[in-house]
Each structure stands twice: as C-alpha cells, then as structure tokens.
C-alpha cells in the first residue's frame, strides 16, 4: 500500500489522513451531485471493486480512487457509495482501518459508513446481498442505477462473485469512468506537491545519472544493452540518494520500466519497452530515453532524444520537433481547449517542415497524476474539453519512422521523442521537468566535427557491427599522423575563418568618442555658502576651516573670504626659524591635466596661489592638516558620486517566497569588502525571484545582484585552495560599499587557523594531529556540499522559461587544464572553464570571456626557454591586450591543445610584440591589414610552405608607423621581419663556417671597416645602439647572430 500524505488518524502501522479524507469525500459527493446526469450516468449508487494485488505495473481507476480518498490501495475491497451510506466489504484488518473514518464521513457529507467484514474462507455472497438490498432501499427508482468502472475486468473470487451478484440483481449498471477522470483531473495543493517531487526525481535521474552513464558508455566504447541501462536507471529511481535527491525510498516507485531505444528500432507508444540489443552509438545514430517516476503514487514523465554526429536531415527534424513541442506547451494554459495544444504543434510542422507531418504522433500527450495516462485528458485534435488550473499534463510529441540519407540498416530510419511534465497554474503553466534541457546544443554529440579532415581525432566505432576493412585501413594510415599535425590542420582552418570574421567586423567598425569619464561637477556647483549672511563671524583674522560647509576661510584685505575645499589643489607648510609659511594652490583653467569644462565662467578671474606667514607653528600645522583631511574626504565622496553616475540603472529585486528563501548561504564573506573602519562581518547570500541579495547585520551593508546583469557565474570548490567560492562577473558595474566593480565574489574559508600552544612539533601519527586533519577534511567537505546544494537549486531556478534568454548556469573551473602565470603582478594559478579563462583566488580577479577573444599569441616560444608569455588580443581592438607572463614551458602543449579544442586561433613568436601600435595600425588602415593576409603576419611557419617566387609577398602583415627610407632598406628588411625563413638559417650556417676561428676583436675590426666602406664611418657606437632600439620599437625581430658561439642576447620585452 502506498502512503499519500501525512498520517493523522487510525492506529497500527497504517493510518489514514482524516483531514484529506474529509475534504476529498466532500469534493466527490459535490461533484457527483453536480454532474450526476452527464458524467455519472444518473447513478443512484457507485460501486468500486479493487482487485487483488499484482506484481505487474498497472493503472486502475479503482486503485486510484482508494489512494486519492484513503491514501492507500485497498485490494480485494468493495466500496459502494450511496447518498446516505457508504458500504464497505473487506477483511477484518482493512475494515478496522476504515472504521476510524465513521465520524469524519458523517461530519463531512452526512453519510454513515457500514462495514461488512468477510471471513477468510468466505466468498462474501451473503454480505453482497445485504449491500444490494441497501442500494434498492435507498433509491427512489424501481430499478436503481449503479455506476461502476466497466473497463476493469473482475479478478479473483471475490470480484467475480460481486459481478455475478450485480448482474443478477436486476440493477441497471452504467459506466462512470468519465466521472472519475473529471474528478481526478484537477489536483489540490497536496497532490501538486507530490507531482512536483516526482518530477524533480525524474529529471534528477535523467540529468545526474542517465546522461553521465550514456556519455561514459560512449566515451569508453562499451557494449551495454538497452535492458541493462533500464535496470540501472530503475535502481537509481528507487534509491533517490544516488542522484542526490532527499526523498524516502518507501515513497518512490517507477511509472514504467525506463525506456532506452537506439539502432533504428523505435516505438513511441506509451507501453514501449527496452530490448536486449546493445546501445548503438555510431555516426548518425539516435538514442531515445524516457524516464517516469512516482512519488506517493503520483506520476511524472520526461523523454529526451540524443543525436550522435547527426546528419542535416536529423538536425532539421529535431529542431522542428523541439519548436513544435515548445509551441504545444505554450498552449497549456487555463481556458484553452485541449485540442489547441496539438493544433499548435501541427502548425509549426506545417510551417517549417510539412514533409514531416505524416510522421507526427496523433496526440500531444495526456493528463498525468495517479494514472500515467488519464485518458479523459487526451491532447489530440478532437478533444474540446477546457484546460483548468491544477491540471497536470504529460506533453509528449514525437516523429516516427523518418527516412535518413544513410544506407546503414541501423540509421536509415529514425524516430524522435520529447516529453515534459507540465503543471497548469494561474500564470499559465510550469514545466516541472525543465532542468532536463532539450536545446540542440545539450542533446547533440559530435565526435567528428571536421568533416574535411583526413581523420578525426576522436572516432566512435560501432560496437554492434563488424568494423569495415576501409575503416581499419584509414586508422592504420593515420597512425603516423601526430596530434600536432591534426592541430596544425585545424588551426589553418581557424586562421581562414578568423581572417574572414575580422574582415567583416572591421568593415563595419566605428570610431568611439569620449574618454569614458563620468560627468564632472562644474565650478559654479561648488557653493559653500548661499549668501554672505551664512558666512560665520570670525573675530580673529586667521585661517579657519569650516567642516560643516566644507569651506576654507582665508583673511584677505581684512575680510574672511570663503573658498570651497574642492577648489584647493594642494596645501603646503614650511617652517623657517620662528616663521611658518602656508602656501595654498587652487584649481584654475589652463593647468596641465585639468578639466576646463568644469569652469563655466571662462571670463572670470581665478586665484591661483596664496601665501600666508604665521608665528604660531602649532596653529599652522593644524590648519594644514584640517584642509588636507577635509579635501580628502570631499574628493572621496565626489569620486564615489561620479562613479555612481556612470552606473547602469538596475531592475528592482523581487523578494522571493518562503520556499525561495531556502536558497541561502549563511556566514559568507564578500569581495570586494565593504568600506569603513569597523570590524568586518560575514553575511548571508539569498537567491530571490530575479536576483541575489547579500546582507550583513549592519543595515547599510547590502548588495543586490540581478540575474539579468550576470555575464558569467562560477562555482569553485576548495580542493588545493583555502576557500570555496561563488563568483559573479557582471555586464555592468555595481557599487559594493563605495567601490565600483564588475566582479563580486562570495566565499568561505574551509580551514580554521589553529595555533599549537605546546610549541613542540607533533608526529604525523599523533592521534591529535590525525583527528585535527580529519576535522579539517570534514569541514571542507561540508562547506563544499553546502555550496553545491545552493548552486544546484539556483541552476534549477535559472532553468525556468523566464530566464531562458539569460543562458545562465554556474561554471566550474577545470583544474586539470590549469597553468601558472603572471596576469598582473604576482604569479597565480589560472584555470580555464567551458566559457572563460579565470583566476578567482588572488586579487585582482581575472575573468576573460572566450567569446570576446580574437586571437592568442604565444610569445618567447623557443628551444631552451623555461617559460613563455601569452598575449590575448580581444575582438574590440580598442581594448588593451591582456598579457599573462612567465608561463612554464611545460604547460605549452597543454595550452595549445586547450586553445585548439575551444576553436581559438593561436600563433607563436620568438619575441614579445608591442601591440598598441600594431592594433592602432589595423584600426587606421583595416583594408591594408586584410589585403596583406590578416593575422598571418604572426605565422612563423608561413614561409616554410611557400616557394621562393612568393616568399616576399607571403611575409605577412607587419604593422609599422614609419615609412621606408629607401629601397635598400626594403631589400634588407627580411632579416628584421617577424617571420624568419629557413633561408636565413642556411645563410647563418654558411657565415658561421666562414667566420669560424676568428676572435671577437677581429670581428669587431672587420665590422668597423665595412661601415667605413659604406660611408657610415661617422656613426658612433651610441648612434648604432639608438638606431637598433628604434628598430626594435617597431616590433621587428633582431638580426640573427652570424657566427656560432656567440652569447645569447637578452630579448627586450615590450607591452
């Protein structure tokens, strides 16, 4: 027997929820009276006979009524509802349980419960006669009408006897199935809660168990049968803790055995099953998964289709089905006819792919609840019933037996299926299984992304058919092809795509204006006193500081003249013998670095400097200190005001319900920290309907982060670090205290600072040491789990339809791809994520969106170097190039592999480049940049693959601010090019042979003679160095050494 709700009445192991029973019994009798003639067949009594228990999964109206009304299924029990009595025929134990409801039934609807207890060996015939006699007596008709469920065939001796008694009693029998369908259609709050829990379990099993299981099987190329996957998924449903769902196993069950289909054999009917064939995951294969689970007997369902190296036909069919499915769900709202749901799907198919209309399923699903298929709520083209608030639907849509363009028996025909559990509410609908994404990017797997390549780096081989000889031949042919060669081919294609993309972008680029500064306050706004009467009276003509009005009062010609402290540029004091000199400098137009736009009264006369002498050194130092302090306070306030003026107005935070307040992290720190001199406090981070709120116990320490302002969200659990953190990188700046920032982080330190008072060094096997380490591990695991639970809840909230356009999901940095480098001033461990390159432990934080990167140039790459640098060029050429310096050379191959995997074009160079003039030249003359080959001027290997005839034209684009002085300079420019050819190497080798054995002095003497022969005898050593430095400033490479044994020169580094 399945428990449905909290037990509040009865005794023993089972107890019936009396409150639910009273409420639902009243609903049942009211519905019977209101719809007696149309839905209940004008019945005078309604007889429900529940068959014996069965191991088979089945859905019966009689069992559904037992669970709905009593909370349990009562097998081999007959319940007859009459207008004044309820007769129950059952065993002694069941009768005792139902007997506890007598008072509740009388109070709810004024009926008496009459129990008929059947002995173990009796067929109950005599008790049945009593029930039939009572039905006759309570009816006003000569031939009473008794409603029953006609489709349920009698099972067992008791029910067979009951049907014979009814048939031979002269009572008229009518089918009341439609009445029960309508009764169960609209769910109350308790039922909706059960459906939501079931849907959460279903989506968690698919998302956290089934998908990782499939990915592992495919990745490891295992032979796993559909039936084996079915068994594993069923075990995951029955043990919710496996998928991190905290539901009691006693309350959960499967709606049907999980369905896995692939290999061209598909059945989209609700009663489909998984066969014993192996999962087929070769190219162009389709995998259909359907999962259904129950909580307290209430059903939920989800179905997804996964595509492996899909063909264009499969892509189009899936996208069409997805749009049709979403269109159908959009029509699930109160007041609509159920036929409108199916018609919306048909309209999408007719518009986007009319050839697929014959393949569309004949229904868009059914109602779901205590029964997996509530037949009265069929979402087909003929059902004109109205959708009501509280109904729950399994919106299921499929395309079956579509012909593909492949010849393989396993892939020439395919089917697609999508299903979601949808609740009808006052706002329209809620997709309860939304955490399971059906977006194409989340269900399509590509293991052969480059169709033009000779061989794919990752190849999924078929495990269900013999490998063809041609495939084996290709693999053997490609054994000599290294990863480097594959990467080089991919990078060449990326270079072509990147140059085309850059050309398109530069063709439409516009020049920005302005310096990005916020509005400055004009000088006429800086008013200390509105009129003369407000100036305080001062008896002594000495310098005074008015803190309240932010003014400095200076004695000039016998009067106290006020100056707003913002007009003061600086103040100094100097003591000479007994005299102190105070000098005050003011902001005036025309000074270097001054903003003249602040001075509106251009014709006015401004005081630039004033000097005072005093014989009171104590007063002089006090005045200077007061002016400096007041000026600093006002400057800080004005700076904060200017920063706030540049902020983008955010939407207002909508405080969530009590259920949403459960999404909360307690006792977390924030970075950047709030200002102020008080002790720093931890706070609470709460997720609300449209944003986060962080607050401490101080009322002025509060930060709101709107979901719409979040560009990237990261969750980094503590592994080798001391903190577990959540980090938000924003689209627009916000203020945290008085700091303007785009990065906000919340963290908890996972290790406590412990100081050993004994002072002696403890052994590694010391029990206290072991206990302390275990305590630290437990604390770290507990904090990581708390953060993980918070992240999971927020991700589920973000998966709702209203946040779909934000594309938000917490990203976890991939530590195995991380590397050390210096992005700012100190070395840090930099980690890639799926969308970014981040460093979130040390400040300032580093967050680089991969989508904003134009190219990456790996600099100082060469043999013998211990480290190299990475220059990241952004698509916005006005943005400074980001440099990450001193990356260990051991990380080079891993970084190149990561860049290639993420489709980022990278180049390598032997020296650092001066990127500012390069980008300026590109912006000033984009057409020349495009004509000269785009980014290929960075390609060191370009000259290796070209002939001598085209060598000069293929040197690439070398930006330069200087014009060539003569043709001779152009002729000699090969030795200074960023791209060095093999010819240079050969010349160097020849020169080395000629010069072998000569000393440094001989070489220097020969060089001087050669200079004099060329008319350059006037050039001094200093001039030669200056010309050489100038050449390097144009981002040209230094000349190679023309002899062996020369000491390696230190390569200058330009930013």
Swiss-Prot record:
Alphabetical UniProt keywords: Chromosome, Coiled coil, DNA damage, DNA repair, DNA replication, Nucleus, Transcription, Transcription regulation
Stretch list, region Disordered: 492-519, 942-1055
Subcellular location: Nucleus; Chromosome
Oxidoreductase as UniProt keyword: no
Pfam families reported for this sequence: FACT-Spt16_Nlob (PF14826), Peptidase_M24 (PF00557), PH_SPT16 (PF24824), Rttp106-like_middle (PF08512), SPT16 (PF08644), SPT16_C (PF21091)
Biased composition (Acidic residues): 943-954, 962-994
GO molecular function: nucleosome binding
GO cellular component: a single term: FACT complex
Biased composition (Basic and acidic residues): 492-504, 995-1017
SMART domains hit by this protein: FACT-Spt16_Nlob, Rtt106, SPT16
Major localization class: nucleus
Coiled-coil segments: 313-333, 480-503, 768-789
BP GO annotations: DNA repair; DNA replication; transcription elongation by RNA polymerase II
SUPFAM superfamilies in alphabetical order: Creatinase/aminopeptidase
Quaternary structure note: Component of the FACT complex, a stable heterodimer of SPT16 and SSRP.
Protein family: Belongs to the peptidase M24 family. SPT16 subfamily.
Its job: Component of the FACT complex, a general chromatin factor that acts to reorganize nucleosomes. The FACT complex is involved in multiple processes that require DNA as a template such as mRNA elongation, DNA replication and DNA repair. During transcription elongation the FACT complex acts as a histone chaperone that both destabilizes and restores nucleosomal structure.
Name of the protein described by the UniProt record: FACT complex subunit SPT16
UniProt organism field: Zea mays (Maize)
Primary gene name: SPT16
């Amino acid at each position: 027997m399945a428990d449905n709700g909290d037990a509040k009445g009865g005794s023993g192991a089972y107890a019936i929820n009396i409150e639910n029973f009273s409420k639902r019994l009243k609903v049942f009798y009211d519905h019977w009276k209101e719809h007696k003639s149309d839905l209940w067949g004008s019945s005078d009594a309604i007889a429900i006979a529940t068959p014996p228990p069965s191991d088979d999964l089945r859905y019966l109206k009689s069992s559904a009524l037992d669970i709905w009304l009593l909370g349990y299924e009562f097998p081999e029990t007959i319940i007859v509802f009459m207008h004044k009595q309820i007769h129950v025929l059952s065993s002694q134990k069941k009768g005792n349980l139902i007997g506890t409801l007598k008072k509740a039934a009388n109070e709810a609807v004024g009926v008496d419960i009459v129990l008929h207890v059947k002995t173990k060996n009796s067929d109950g015939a005599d008790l049945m006669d009593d029930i039939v006699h009572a039905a006759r007596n309570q009816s006003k008709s000569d031939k009473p009408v008794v409603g029953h469920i006609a489709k349920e065939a009698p099972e067992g001796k008791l029910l067979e006897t009951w049907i014979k008694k009814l048939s031979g009693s002269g009572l008229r029998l009518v089918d009341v199935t439609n009445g029960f369908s309508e009764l169960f259609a609209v769910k109350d709050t308790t039922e909706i809660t059960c459906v939501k829990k079931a849907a959460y379990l279903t989506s968690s099993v698919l998302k956290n168990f089934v998908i990782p299981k499939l990915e592992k099987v495919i990745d490891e190329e295992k032979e796993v049968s559909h039936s084996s996957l079915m068994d594993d998924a069923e075990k995951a449903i029955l043990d919710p803790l496996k998928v991190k769902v905290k539901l009691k196993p006693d309350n959960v069950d499967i709606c049907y055995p999980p369905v896995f289909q692939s290999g061209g054999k598909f059945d989209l009917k609700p009663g489909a099953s998984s066969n014993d064939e192996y999962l087929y995951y070769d190219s162009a294969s389709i995998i259909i998964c359907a999962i259904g689970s129950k909580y307290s007997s209430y059903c939920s369902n989800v179905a997804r289709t996964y595509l492996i190296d899909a063909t264009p036909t499969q892509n189009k069919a899936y996208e069409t089905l997805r749009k049709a499915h979403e269109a159908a769900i959009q029509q699930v709202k109160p007041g609509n006819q159920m036929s409108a749901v199916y018609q919306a799907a048909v309209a999408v198919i007719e518009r986007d792919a009319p050839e697929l209309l014959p393949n569309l399923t004949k229904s868009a699903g059914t109602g779901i609840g205590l029964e997996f298929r509530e037949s009265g709520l069929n979402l087909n083209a003929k059902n004109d019933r109205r959708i009501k608030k509280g109904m729950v639907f399994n919106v299921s849509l499929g395309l079956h037996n579509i012909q593909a363009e492949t010849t393989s028996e396993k892939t020439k025909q395919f089917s697609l299926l999508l299903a979601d559990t949808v609740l009808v509410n006052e706002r329209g609908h809620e997709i309860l299984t939304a955490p399971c994404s059906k977006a194409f990017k989340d269900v399509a797997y590509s293991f052969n992304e480059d169709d033009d390549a000779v061989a794919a780096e990752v190849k999924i081989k078929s495990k269900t058919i013999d490998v063809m000889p041609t495939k084996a031949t290709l693999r053997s042919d490609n054994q000599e092809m290294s990863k480097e060669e594959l990467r080089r081919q991919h990078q060449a294609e990326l270079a072509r795509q990147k140059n085309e993309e850059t050309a398109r972008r530069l063709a439409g680029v516009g020049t920005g204006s302005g310096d990005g500064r916020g509005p400055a306050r004009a000088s006429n706004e800086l008013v200390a006193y509105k009129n003369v009467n407000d100036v305080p009276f001062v008896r002594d003509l000495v310098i005074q500081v008015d803190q309240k009005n932010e003014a400095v009062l200076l004695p000039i010609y016998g009067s106290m003249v006020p100056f707003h402290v913002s007009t003061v540029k600086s103040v100094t004091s100097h003591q000479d013998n007994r005299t102190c000199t105070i000098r005050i400098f003011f902001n005036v137009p025309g000074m270097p670095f001054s903003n003249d736009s602040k001075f509106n009264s251009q014709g006015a006369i401004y005081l630039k400097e004033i000097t005072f002498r005093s014989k009171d050194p104590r007063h002089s130092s006090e005045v200077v200190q007061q002016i400096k302090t007041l000026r600093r306070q006002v400057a800080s306030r004005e700076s904060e005001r200017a920063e706030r003026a540049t902020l983008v107005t955010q939407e207002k935070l909508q405080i969530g319900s009590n259920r949403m307040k459960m999404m909360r992290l307690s006792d977390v720190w924030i970075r950047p920290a709030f200002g102020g001199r008080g002790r720093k406090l931890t706070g609470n981070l709460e997720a609300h309907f449209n944003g986060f709120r962080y607050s401490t116990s101080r009322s002025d320490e509060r930060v709101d982060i709107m979901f719409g302002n979040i560009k990237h969200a990261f969750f980094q659990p503590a592994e080798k670090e001391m903190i577990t953190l959540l980090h938000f990188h924003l689209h627009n700046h916000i203020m945290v205290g008085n700091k303007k920032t785009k990065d906000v982080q919340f963290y908890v330190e996972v290790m406590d600072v412990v100081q050993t008072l004994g002072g002696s060094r403890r052994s590694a096997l010391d029990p206290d040491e072991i206990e302390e380490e275990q305590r630290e591990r437990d604390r770290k695991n507990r904090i990581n789990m708390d953060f993980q639970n918070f992240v999971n809840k927020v991700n589920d909230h973000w998966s709702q339809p209203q946040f779909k356009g934000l594309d938000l999901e917490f990203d976890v940095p991939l530590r195995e791809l991380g590397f050390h480098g210096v992005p700012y001033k100190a070395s840090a461990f930099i980690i890639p994520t799926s969308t970014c390159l981040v460093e979130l432990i040390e400040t300032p934080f580093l967050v680089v969106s991969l989508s904003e990167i134009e190219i990456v140039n790996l600099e100082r790459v060469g043999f013998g170097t211990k480290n190299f640098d990475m220059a990241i060029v952004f698509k916005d050429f006005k943005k400074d190039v980001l440099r990450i310096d001193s990356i260990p050379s051991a990380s080079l191959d891993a970084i190149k592999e990561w860049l290639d995997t993420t489709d980022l074009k990278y180049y390598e160079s032997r020296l650092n480049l001066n990127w500012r003039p390069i980008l300026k030249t590109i912006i000033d003359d984009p057409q020349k940049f495009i004509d000269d080959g785009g980014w290929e001027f960075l390609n060191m290997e370009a000259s290796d693959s070209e002939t001598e005839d085209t060598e000069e034209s293929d040197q690439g684009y070398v930006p330069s601010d200087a014009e060539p002085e003569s043709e001779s300079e152009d002729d000699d420019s090969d030795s200074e090019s960023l791209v060095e050819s093999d010819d240079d190497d050969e010349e160097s080798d020849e020169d080395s042979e000629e010069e072998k054995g000569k000393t440094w002095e001989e070489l220097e003497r020969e060089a001087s003679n050669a200079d004099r022969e060329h008319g350059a005898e006037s050039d001094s050593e200093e001039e030669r160095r200056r010309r050489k430095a100038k050449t390097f400033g144009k981002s040209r490479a230094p000349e190679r050494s023309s002899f062996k044994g020369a000491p390696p020169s230190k390569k200058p580094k330009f930013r």
